[in-house]
């Protein structure tokens, strides 16, 4: 079996290896033959440093995560994909519940079962529209890799949604939800740029179109549910 190649986080060029390990805890980082920089400085960084650079939307951090951490050619990637889909839908459901509770205040007249069903329908319909519109816009505007790789990229780069869990703790205003939504959009665009090597403007346009359609479908679905 051929050894899997890694990617230089500086220029995106393929490299044979990221480091040479001489003994446990003793290794040397390799340089990229193309740009002559250290291929992946994040190998020896703490997870917190990587997370901060992801929040800052550094392309180096996204290359490290998408190419050198996640092995998209692995047989286990399908298992990872299903886990990410579930986590993404759960976070989106939590977002919808936060918005609903904020807008409805203390209204508890709606049964829990009906409310849960309505939220589930809203989340599934909005995300179906998001994936469909994203795939359509990307096909028109970008050089597309495989669909599975793009889906994995979007799911991973939506990690910003985890900040929604901080809202009930610190009692943030509802506007924070929309700030998180904007961060998810820009994070998706950076990850898409890394995966497709397309212009930033095109990647932003694709993500803006997909997120806008998702927002519209979510609003329409929520309105239909409220009048039923």
From Swiss-Prot:
Family annotation (InterPro entries): Arv1
Gene Ontology terms: biological process: intracellular sterol transport; sphingolipid metabolic process; sterol metabolic process
Primary location class: endoplasmic reticulum
Membrane-protein topology: Multi-pass membrane protein
Glycosylation sites noted in the Swiss-Prot or TrEMBL record: 107
Keyword terms: Endoplasmic reticulum, Glycoprotein, Lipid metabolism, Lipid transport, Membrane, Sphingolipid metabolism, Transmembrane, Transmembrane helix, Transport
Transmembrane annotation, as ranges: 37-57, 80-100, 123-143, 150-170, 176-196
Tissue-by-tissue expression: Restricted to tissues in which cells are actively dividing or expanding. Mostly expressed in roots and flowers, and, to a lower extent, in stems and leaves.
Compartments (UniProt record): Endoplasmic reticulum membrane
Record GO cellular component, one term: endoplasmic reticulum
Protein family membership: Belongs to the ARV1 family.
Functional description taken from the UniProt entry: Mediator of sterol homeostasis involved in sterol uptake, trafficking and distribution into membranes. Also regulates the sphingolipid metabolism.
Protein name: Protein ARV 2
Species, as recorded: Arabidopsis thaliana (Mouse-ear cress)
């Amino acid at each position: 079996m051929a050894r899997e190649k890694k990617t230089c986080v500086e220029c995106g060029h393929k490299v044979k290896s990221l480091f040479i390990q001489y003994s446990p805890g003793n290794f040397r980082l390799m340089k990229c033959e193309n740009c002559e920089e250290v291929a992946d400085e994040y190998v020896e960084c703490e997870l917190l440093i990587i997370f901060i650079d992801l929040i800052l939307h550094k392309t180096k951090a996204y290359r490290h995560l998408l190419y050198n951490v996640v092995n998209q050619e692995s047989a286990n990637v399908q298992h990872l994909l299903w886990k990410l889909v579930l986590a993404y839908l759960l976070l989106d459901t939590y977002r919808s519940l936060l918005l609903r509770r904020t807008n409805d205040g203390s209204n508890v007249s709606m049964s829990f079962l009906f409310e849960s069903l309505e939220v589930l329908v809203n989340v599934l319909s909005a995300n179906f529209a998001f994936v469909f519109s994203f795939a359509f816009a990307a096909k028109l505007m970008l050089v597309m890799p495989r669909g599975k790789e793009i889906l994995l990229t979007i799911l991973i780069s939506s990690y910003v949604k985890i900040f929604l869990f901080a809202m009930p703790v610190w009692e943030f205003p509802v506007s924070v939800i929309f700030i998180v939504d904007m961060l998810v959009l820009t994070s998706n665009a950076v990850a898409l740029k890394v995966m497709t090597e397309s212009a930033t403007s095109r990647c932003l346009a694709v993500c803006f179109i997909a997120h806008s359609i998702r927002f519209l479908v979510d609003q329409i679905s929520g309105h239909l549910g409220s009048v039923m």
